[in-house]
């Protein structure tokens, strides 16, 4: 894993094999809307077909465009967290954009709705400013988390500090993907030893918090036999159920 490419690949493989994710196609990303329209459409058709049909009866062949554009408008005005929790309106229909974990598994319908969430890991998409984040995690077509990954054992020798610099200098905080609250809500700077996070990109003023477990009463993470020290980020924190819980219960902006 002594290169950033293989580090990135290993994280993707973990998320898509045991983490409950689907591998995303960067070509499916629409930089104008900062959405994955195909996933938006697939999720709504799968979980809210009756509402889709009602909108279709009014919009016909423009149904997909109308729904996706109304979603983009809601995200721009209400913010991603509000839309995930409260939904958005389109042609008089209240559309949900996420189904969170039920308190009990007794209700089969609610469990099926929860299982229908489309969670994807997409590498190397291109934004409208031709930025190429290492990895973007999305829920039902809405990008929510970005990761910049560095491997200090690679030829470049870049580490988590370089990832933080990349967020500060090379990511447009006013761009569609990165603008505060409107799409992505968490940004992780990661290497094989440490993780830092922020919820708001603000150029040189971006403030990162450590997202480490600590080691010997100090910073960092304990060594892990057969894996890198930061593996908990993708095997625990970002695994499907934990990912959903972050946006259902724990995030406040």
Show where each model-derived region lies.
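ATP-dependent helicase/translocase motor core
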Residues: 2-253
């Amino acid at each position: 894993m002594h290169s950033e490419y293989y580090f990135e690949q290993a994280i993707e493989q973990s998320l898509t094999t045991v983490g409950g994710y689907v591998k995303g196609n960067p070509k499916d990303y629409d930089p104008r809307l900062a959405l994955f329209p195909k996933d938006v459409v697939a999720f709504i058709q799968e979980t809210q077909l009756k509402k889709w049909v009602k909108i279709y009866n009014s919009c016909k062949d423009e149904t997909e465009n109308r729904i996706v554009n109304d979603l983009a408008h809601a995200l721009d005005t209400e913010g991603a967290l509000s839309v995930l929790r409260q939904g958005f309106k389109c042609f008089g229909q209240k559309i949900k954009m996420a189904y969170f974990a039920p308190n009990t598994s007794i209700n089969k319908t609610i469990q099926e709705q929860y299982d229908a969430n489309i969670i994807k890991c997409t590498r190397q998409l291109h934004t409208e400013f031709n930025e190429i984040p290492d990895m973007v995690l999305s829920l039902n077509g809405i990008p929510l988390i970005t990761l910049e990954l560095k491997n200090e054992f690679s030829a470049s020798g870049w580490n988590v500090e370089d990832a933080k610099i990349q967020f500060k200098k090379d990511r447009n905080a006013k761009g569609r993907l990165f603008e505060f609250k409107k799409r992505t809500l968490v940004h992780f700077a990661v290497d094989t030893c440490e993780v830092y996070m922020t919820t708001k990109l603000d150029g040189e003023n971006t403030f990162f918090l450590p997202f480490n477990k600590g080691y010997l009463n100090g910073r960092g993470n304990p060594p892990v036999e057969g894996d890198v020290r930061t593996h908990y980020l993708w095997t625990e924190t970002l695994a499907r159920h934990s990912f959903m819980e972050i946006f259902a219960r724990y995030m406040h902006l």
